[in-house]
Amino acid sequence: MNPVPAQREYFLDSIRAWLMLLGIPFHISLIYSSHTWHVNSAEPSLWLTLFNDFIHSFRMQVFFVISGYFSYMLFLRYPLKKWWKVRVERVGIPMLTAIPLLTLPQFIMLQYVKGKAESWPGLSLYDKYNTLAWELISHLWFLLVLVVMTTLCVWIFKRIRNNLENSDKTNKKFSMVKLSVIFLCLGIGYAVIRRTIFIVYPPILSNGMFNFIVMQTLFYLPFFILGALAFIFPHLKALFTTPSRGCTFAAALAFVAYLLNQRYGSGDAWMYETESVITMVLGLWMVNVVFSFGHRLLNFQSARVTYFVNASLFIYLVHHPLTLFFGAYITPHITSNWLGFLCGLIFVVGIAIILYEIHLRIPLLKFLFSGKPVVKRENDKAPAR
């Protein structure tokens, strides 16, 4: 087995937590954006729409790179079956917990907010199933994708490790140009697959489980594997943690292209295929921007940072129904979009932290929302003297 570095990657922990917590301003700004969501303000805000688009354009690509990095690190630490079990428990248990406790109540609330409760009995069995798939998975989709990726990587990581044993990894060289070409080709390949499905059988693209399990996994798997390779090859990791003006400039241009596609593209034409190509390369370049920024400013340990690193998943899980509640019942009473956005942040973050502190004091909830069994310390077991 390859040795696992003893030094903790504090900046990667921090970046992962910040990317998770960015989901809060992302969804609150979605209320005030020009994008149609479950709940929207009376008038959209141009700047909050731009802010929302910026977060959406790169956040999950970078997140899956970090997930792949830590996943391969644990792959080297545990036997294969235990690695799969630990990884699936860490993401699967919180997902299964959040469905009845968070997204089901959220779905029921939205049925009444949007006036759809009366029409529910009239839906076909498939429409009910598909609606529940979209609404109950909801913002938990990335956890489902991680379960699928972990299962696929039982084979992929084994192949990578076997290939490394038969080759000299010190001779592997990477360049951002080469990676950009590879990810451009991957983006085009994904676009071709999506367009082919759209031509052959379009209804499957509106199927919630197919979207999450197949399409989302297919798009984000290259970033997950890229993270694993960054753990294996120090040169590749250094390529991402070293600031690059070229990547910053390219990412800025790609974001402009993303905005233009959002504004002028058509869903009936090539909008989604174009977006997949843009966000594939944009995500790669933003890995460099985010990693280099985080490596310079976040590579340290502190109690406050550790608190939010540990709390980030729970806060993310509970923020979504809180955001929708705020949008449905409080947003209509605030005339200013920016004031509403700030009030939403205070409302959602404040309640989420309170709920986090409460759940820490209930062992069952602490286990269910983390997937980690409660381990008693040896000192707790020792008899009093």
Curated annotation (Swiss-Prot):
The lineage of its organism: Bacteria, Pseudomonadati, Pseudomonadota, Gammaproteobacteria, Enterobacterales. It comes from Escherichia coli O1:K1 / APEC. Its main location: membrane. Pathway: Glycan metabolism; osmoregulated periplasmic glucan (OPG) biosynthesis. One of its GO terms (molecular function) is acyltransferase activity, transferring groups other than amino-acyl groups. The gene is mdoC. GO terms for biological process: glucan biosynthetic process. This is Glucans biosynthesis protein C. The keyword S-adenosyl-L-methionine does not apply. Necessary for the succinyl substitution of periplasmic glucans. Could catalyze the transfer of succinyl residues from the cytoplasmic side of the membrane to the nascent glucan backbones on the periplasmic side of the membrane. InterPro entries: Acyl_transf_3_dom (IPR002656), Glucan_succinyl_AcylTrfase (IPR050623), Glucans_biosynth_C (IPR023723). Coiled coil: none annotated.
